[in-house]
A protein has these predicted regions:
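Short beta-strand segments
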Residues: 15-18, 50-54, 118, 142, ...
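Internal gly/pro-rich beta-alpha loop/helix module
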Residues: 16-86
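Glycine/charged-rich beta-loop-alpha catalytic/anionic-binding loops adjacent to active sites
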Residues: 11-22, 190-195
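Accessory alpha-helical/coil subdomains and C-terminal extensions
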Residues: 59-146, 151-152
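Short Gly/Thr/Asp-enriched flexible loops that form oxyanion-binding sites at enzyme active sites
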Residues: 1-12, 151-158
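C-terminal non-catalytic interaction/assembly regions of soluble proteins
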Residues: 146-210
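Short amphipathic alpha-helical segments and helix-helix/interface helices
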Residues: 4, 38, 128, 156-160, ...
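Short coil/turn connectors at secondary-structure junctions
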Residues: 9-13, 44-48, 53, 79, ...
Length: 210
């Protein structure tokens, strides 16, 4: 969630919420999500950008849309919820914050040409070449497991040339849980040697924003 990177020195919570069923419908989850978000913001001031859905408050830049048609619409694969709201409200990863006296900083985020490549067996090097021929400033590789890629020297040469040309290349796993470790296997280590940066456990959305 880009707000997490745009708003610095927050002195109050910013909570984003919504609904899976439109608010105009009788069974909408929107009213409960909104009321709980307001109550939590007023009484449990976790001064960061959060996402509240279905009784859970997630860190904004750690959350992903996980379900298309369930009330558990969002998840945070690599970080427990900040807070859970049941009969009682329970802090988990969240911490009640003291107000800060620093002025709010609003970082400007402008659209950037970024390529995303989802690796698969037999992927053509020409496909990657065509992407980096465009005026891209960065390339995100969706790799296997802990950051592995096909053992393809032509692809490595292509990525190395892109890195030498100033294109930032980040390795993000296709897995939603766990972290990239390019030292774990030879194929991942080969990416590291040509200058590919580890995305660690960031979501694709957070990587694109950064």
């Amino acid at each position: 969630m880009r707000f997490s990177f745009m708003l610095e020195n927050l002195s109050k919570p910013v909570i984003v919420t919504g609904s899976q069923i439109p608010l105009s419908q009788l069974r909408s989850d929107g009213q409960e999500n909104l009321l709980n978000s307001l109550y939590i913001a007023a009484n449990y001031p976790i001064n960061e950008v959060g996402l509240y859905f279905n009784n859970k408050l997630f860190r904004g830049n750690r959350s992903i849309k996980a379900y298309a048609d369930g009330f558990n619409a969002f998840d945070s694969p690599n970080l427990p919820p900040l807070l859970e709201a049941g009969i009682n409200i329970k802090l988990i990863e969240g911490k009640i914050s003291e107000p800060v006296s620093l002025p709010l900083k609003l970082a400007q985020i402008t659209p950037q040409p970024i390529g995303v490549v989802h690796l698969y067996p037999g992927i053509s090097v020409e496909l990657i070449k065509n992407i980096i021929k465009q005026p891209v400033k960065a390339l995100i590789i969706r790799s296997y497991g802990v950051g592995n890629a096909p053992q393809n020297q032509a692809m490595l040469d292509c990525l190395k040339q892109a890195n030498d040309d100033g294109i930032v290349i980040v390795n993000c796993s296709q897995c939603i849980k766990g972290t990239v470790n390019m030292k774990g296997y030879a194929t991942g280590n080969a990416l590291s040697k040509i200058g590919v940066i580890s995305g660690n456990d960031m979501t694709l959305e957070a990587t694109l924003t950064k």
